[in-house]
């Protein structure tokens, strides 16, 4: 039984490290997105988002596995946990010093990369918001510079003409 639980702890540590590596890839994609946002390259942003979505699907699968491992460990070791779900700290508190140190380090490194990802996502969100505001202002200015003049010709038909017309591609 003890060997089986050590195996679960080792598997959990490896899982955390795999998640950390995937989040590092996500961080790199977010950095590329920053450049694409600045260059206003929608196609690149879309391609990066598709890649990122695949990685997030992997993370979701790993998270399910991690929760399952933690619950299995908790059940076999009668781990007391605070709240409804078992935390990594709950497991760290019950394992030997070497395993505790390894799990704690894996958890800390995962948390560091998660914070980096969150920070760069916040920056990218602000960049996108700023770009949208810029385009809203630009479009408003262009709309205001377009006018419609109309009158009637000798034949009684209305003649309408737009001066300074602005054409928009609604699919863009």
PLM regions: where:
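Short hydrophobic/aromatic-rich motifs at helix boundaries and adjacent loops
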Residues: 1-6, 107-111
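Short terminal interaction segments
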Residues: 84-172
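Extended, charge-rich alpha-helical scaffolding segments
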Residues: 2-93
């Amino acid at each position: 039984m003890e060997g089986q639980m050590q195996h679960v702890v080792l598997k959990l540590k490896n899982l955390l490290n795999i998640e950390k590596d995937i989040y590092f890839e996500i961080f790199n994609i977010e950095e590329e997105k920053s450049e694409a946002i600045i260059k206003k390259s929608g196609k690149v942003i879309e391609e990066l988002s598709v890649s990122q979505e695949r990685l997030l699907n992997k993370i979701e699968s790993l998270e399910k596995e991690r929760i399952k491992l933690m619950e299995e460990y908790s059940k076999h070791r009668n781990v007391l946990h605070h709240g409804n779900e078992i935390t990594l700290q709950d497991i760290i508190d019950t394992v030997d010093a070497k395993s505790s140190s390894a799990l704690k380090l894996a958890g800390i490194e995962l948390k560091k990369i998660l914070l980096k990802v969150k920070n760069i996502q916040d920056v990218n969100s602000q960049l996108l918001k700023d770009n949208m505001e810029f385009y809203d202002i630009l479009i408003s200015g262009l709309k205001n510079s377009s006018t419609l003049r109309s009158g009637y010709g000798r034949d009684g038909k209305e003649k309408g003409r737009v001066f300074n017309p602005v054409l928009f591609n609604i699919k863009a």
